[in-house]
Swiss-Prot record:
Recorded catalytic activity of this chain's protein: (S)-2,3,4,5-tetrahydrodipicolinate + NAD(+) + H2O = (2S,4S)-4-hydroxy-2,3,4,5-tetrahydrodipicolinate + NADH + H(+); (S)-2,3,4,5-tetrahydrodipicolinate + NADP(+) + H2O = (2S,4S)-4-hydroxy-2,3,4,5-tetrahydrodipicolinate + NADPH + H(+)
Gene3D superfamilies the record matches: Dihydrodipicolinate Reductase, domain 2, NAD(P)-binding Rossmann-like Domain
This protein's UniProt keywords: Amino-acid biosynthesis, Cytoplasm, Diaminopimelate biosynthesis, Lysine biosynthesis, NAD, NADP, Oxidoreductase
Pathway linked to the protein: Amino-acid biosynthesis; L-lysine biosynthesis via DAP pathway; (S)-tetrahydrodipicolinate from L-aspartate: step 4/4
Protein source organism: Bifidobacterium longum (strain NCC 2705)
Example of a GO MF term: NAD binding
Stored CDD domains: DHDPR_N
NCBIfam families named in the record: dapB
Single GO BP term: diaminopimelate biosynthetic process
Protein name in UniProt: 4-hydroxy-tetrahydrodipicolinate reductase
Length: 251
């Protein structure tokens, strides 16, 4: 049995993670901690893998503390910048088990979203134009979503490798309506009551358009991906920092 501790256990995602861990045949809940709880309760004696689902403002400190405890961590919190990732890598290198420490960060745990992202990177080189639209519930704290940013980076890298010119755009004034530009790709965020988590990637050429869309209607859609990551970290996942569930899928 894989002993799993959950940080952010009383949050929207954390509650689902606790339930998923309790219901899976090969995992058992070790500790369920939330804001204000002492993370040093989590040790390698009582925990094999930690799942961290909190908020961007505290996630980095949580992960650094857990690395210091020598436990492997699955992170579902978004808002990770290059600077924050560099701090995680440094903490691993200087932590108690630099050769075996595993930290996994996923922009999205929904299999549909991971596949949509993968398909988008494959399609990117064939189209002159590309834009990303992400749609979420109005209580989401970050915009654009980490998934959308990750998708935009992947599209940009594929376009660069193919030698494509920048996407065409004659806009001179927009007042912010053209969204955030991520590596030359426009990313738009919608926050609307009734939505959960959705993403559309639009590709265009003269006379044609391709739309790739992923919809998560309920947070239970993320749990198979979370459990996959837990099992991989408890098993054959490589040491160090891994980003993206695609690394654990046969793509």
């Amino acid at each position: 049995m894989i002993k799993v501790s959950v940080v952010g256990a009383k949050g929207r995602m954390g509650l689902h993670v606790v339930e998923a861990v309790n219901n899976a045949e090969d995992t058992q809940l070790a500790l369920a901690l939330d804001a204000g709880d002492d993370l040093t309760q989590i040790t390698t004696d009582n925990t094999d893998v930690v799942v961290e689902f909190t908020v961007p403002s505290v996630s980095l400190n949580n992960v650094l503390t857990l690395i210091g405890q020598g436990v492997d961590v699955v992170v579902g919190t978004t808002g990770w910048t290059d600077e924050k990732l560099a701090q995680v890598k440094s903490a691993i290198a200087n932590g108690p088990k630099p050769e075996t420490q595993k930290v996994f960060i996923a922009p999205n745990f929904a299999i549909s979203a991971v596949l949509a992202d993968y398909f988008a990177t494959k399609a990117a080189k064939y189209f002159e134009s590309a834009e990303v639209i992400e749609l979420h519930h109005p209580t989401k704290v970050d915009a654009p979503s980490g998934t959308a940013i990750h998708t935009a980076h992947g599209i940009a890298e594929a376009r660069k490798a193919a030698g494509l010119a920048p996407v065409p755009d004659a806009t001179e004034t927009d007042g912010g309506s053209r969204g955030q530009v991520v590596d030359g790709i426009h990313v738009h965020a919608v926050r609307l009551r009734g939505l959960n988590a959705h993403e559309e990637v639009l590709f265009g050429n003269a006379g044609e358009q391709l739309t790739i869309r992923a919809d998560s209607f309920d947070r239970t859609s993320f749990m198979p991906g979370v459990l996959l990551a837990v099992r991989k970290l408890a098993g054959d996942a490589p040491a160090g920092l891994t980003i993206g569930l695609d690394h654990f899928l046969d793509l």
